[in-house]
Amino acid sequence: EFLSIANTLMQHIEEYVPTDFPPIYNIYRWWNPPQAEFLAKLKSAIKTVEDDAVVQLLTVSFCRIVIELSNAAFNHVSTSFKDGNEGFFSIDIAKEAFISVCEMVAKGALLQPRATSKVLLHDSRSIPAECYGAYDTVITSPPYPNRISYIRELRPYMYWLDYLETSDQASDLDWQAIGGTWGRATSLLGTWKSDHSLPQYVYDIAEKISNADNKSAGLMANYVLKYFEDMQKHLSSVYAGLAAKGREF
C-alpha cells in the first residue's frame, strides 16, 4: 500500500498546491527554486494521506529526498554547499528518485525488531529515577568533542518537518545538547559557569587554553569544560541505569 500510494502521489505531484517554503535562512542556497518547489508540492501531497503508518514511511522518504535534491555537499566533517547553479533539474528524474527512495524505505520497514521498543524524550545527563538499575545493557553514542553541531546538520529536516521556525529555536536546542555551540549557543558560553565536578587537571588544561594568544581562547576553554562536565553527568547517569552486572557500550 505504501508504494502504491507513493506512485499515485508522483503521478499527480504537479497538481498539488505547494506548501509555504520553510523559513530556513537563505533557502535557495540549500535548494534551487525548482527543487524547493518540488519538495513543497511533495510535502503538500503527503498531507493528503490518511493512513498514519504510510505517512510515517512517506515522511522518512521525504527526508531522504530533501537531501538528495539539495545543494549540500558532504566533503567535509560539517555540511557545506555545492555551487547552487550546478546541475539540471528534471521533475521526472525527481519523481523516479523519490520512488527509488520509497522502495529502499519499504525494504527497511520489513525488518522489524523482535523486542518491544519505547521512545522517551529526556535529558541524557539525568535519567528518570524509575530507570535506575533497570537495564542489563545500555548503548550510548555521545557526541565527539569536535564542536560539530548536530542541530546544524539536521536543520534541513527540522525546518521542512516544521519542528523549527526560527534560528533561535535551533540555537536553544543546540545549547541543551552535549557539545552544542551553534548560533546563539556560542555567545552563551561566555557567561556559562563551571560546576567544578571534574578532576583538577582538566581545569588546568582549560586554563592553558584560555591563556592562548587567540581572541576565542576563553570561549574554547569554556567549551572544553562544558563538554566534559556534561559528559561526566551523562556517563554517571548511564551507570545509574545499569542493573547489577549490566554492561555499557
Residue map of PLM features:
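Class I S-adenosyl-L-methionine-dependent methyltransferase module
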Residues: E1-L110, I151-G218, Y239
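Conserved SAM-binding strand-loop segment of SAM-dependent methyltransferases
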Residues: P113-S126
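A short acidic, Gly/Pro-enriched loop at the edge of an enzyme's catalytic core
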Residues: S126-I139, R147
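Conserved binding/catalytic microenvironments
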Residues: P142
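Short, contiguous acidic/charged loop-to-helix segments that flank catalytic cores in large enzymes
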Residues: G218-E229
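A short glycine-rich, Lys/Arg-flanked "PGG" loop and its adjoining helix->strand segment in the class I
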Residues: F228-A244
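Short glycine-centered segments of the SAM/dcSAM-binding site in methyltransferase folds
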Residues: R247-E248
